[in-house]
Amino acid sequence: LWTKELRYYDPEEWYHTDAMRSIHAEEEFKRVTSEFDRLLAAHGYEREGLYYRAVRPNRDTIVLFCHFGVECVLLSHLMHVSPMPLWHGLCAAPSSVTTIYTEERRQGIASFRAGTFGDVSHLYAAGEEPSFAARFCETWDNKEERHD
């Protein structure tokens, strides 16, 4: 179980485990997050260490369409936490909506906060049920639902 390895909870160590090294997780994580930082910089928010400088504060809206796994990588980068607890402890169904906004609590320093995560209210409003595809079996004996 991954939960027995404390490095998986550390934002600087999770990709140094044998399992993550075998899939080049550090390189992929850094590739994705550096491109994300480039996008944010183009919109006026430049990463400096563990925070973002608001060099051109604005109210731009950036819309990203991505897989849950990438969503957790981006959120973990913004929050400086390991993506492992996000991947295993959260669920964003297909077509769900997550809303992140900036707050400039201190002049020139931007914080990112999640206003909603995995919202599916638009599906319910349209009379649709959210997909079970993002989830695993609720009980092990249910052979109709996905198992690990």
What annotation goes with each model-predicted range?
Residues 1-43:
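Phosphate-handling substructures
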Residues 13-19, 67-68, 78, 118:
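Generic detector of bulky aromatic hydrophobic side chains
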Residues 30-64, 70:
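A mid-sequence, solvent-exposed acidic-amphipathic segment
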Residues 8-9, 69-72:
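Short hydrophobic/aromatic-rich motifs at helix boundaries and adjacent loops
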Residues 50-61, 73-148:
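Acidic, low-complexity terminal tails and accessory targeting/binding regions
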